[in-house]
Amino acid sequence: MPKPSSPPSAHDVARVAGVSKAAVSRAFTPGASIAEETQNKVFRAAKSLGYRPNLIARSLNKGKSGIVGVIFGGNPRNPFFLTALYALLARLSRAGKHILVFTVDSHANADVHAEDLLKYRVDALLLMATSLSAKLAEQCHDEGVPILFFNRRPPKIKGFSSVAENNSEGGRKIAEHLLSQGYKRLAVVAGSDGSSTARERESGFGAYLTSRGLPAPEREVGHFHREGAVQAARNLLSRKPRPDAIFCVNDYMALAAIEVARYEFGLEIGREIGIAGFDDIDEASWPSFELTTYSVSMESIIDGVAAFLLNTARQKNPLHTVIDGVLKPRRSTQRK
């Protein structure tokens, strides 16, 4: 049985086109200086031979792969994460970066996928709604691969960078707003206990209540999922006395809480039960919800992430960017 022939090389293209190997390289490099006639010769020869340039090998020759590794552990049904992920991929693609995305269960750490991505010689590693062990983080550091956390700051890992919303301030502003509207019995639907994002939002909310001499809010955990939020809202609304306002630490859970309060308990949203969220996803402004929320510009978040990932060679020390937002009061907390 004859051995399969090896794929054509740049040397083969140069020979058929009658040009130098350097000319072949320039022909496939966007923006490189090369005569149009020479480039056309190279393209015709490449097509006839079935040649495709090895972009990864070319990048590695320059010391960088041009690949950003992304490990995504967020709820794929949450519009916040989908919007962020697609916006980021578009931004990095426009900048000429290649993106390799791995998904991981939200309850697992990203070690296995991080090890795989290191084999691809990624220029940087972005973690969205997932975490990494201290051992793997140290391995990334030793191999010169910077780590960036999206909207999360895990306390047990050193040497990482982060871009995050001002989560604690957002929680504080939600609490202040609910009290200003006359709500007195406040509760919270928390996220996952292992999430720094959830902890910071809940902490800011509770700290403001404490500063006003009020007790800690009643609490149920929604795990950032619709099903968890539905059960958490049911549990809270079944208590005696019932809370008159609920802060859900993201909009996705808040929308579920509104539906439970409205359709299962027959409550008028705003007047009989206030519900607030966090993130300002598109659905929050829909007439059927009109959800009060804390809004951080997605463009600002992506700007911060892209600025880091596109300038990894200049990042000598960890950077932590915190992006402020604004409270967006809507009908879901209009009691007066």
What function would you assign to each model-found segment?
Residues S20, D123, Y183-R185, P215, ...:
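Short acidic/polar active-site loop segments enriched in Thr and Asp
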Residues G73-T83, V101-N109, R152, V163-K173, ...:
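Hinge/beta->alpha junction and helix N-cap segments in small-molecule ligand-binding domains
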Residues V13, V24, V42, V68, ...:
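Hydrophobic structural packing positions in well-ordered secondary structure
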Residues M1-S5, I67-E176, S238:
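Alpha-helical recognition/docking segments in bacterial nutrient-uptake
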Residues V16, K21-A23, L60-P76, H177, ...:
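Short beta-strand segments enriched in small/hydrophobic residues
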Residues M1-G66:
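N-terminal helix-turn-helix DNA-binding module of bacterial transcription factors
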Residues L49, K119-R121, Q181, L236-R242, ...:
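Glycine-rich phosphate-binding loop signature in dinucleotide/nucleotide-binding domains
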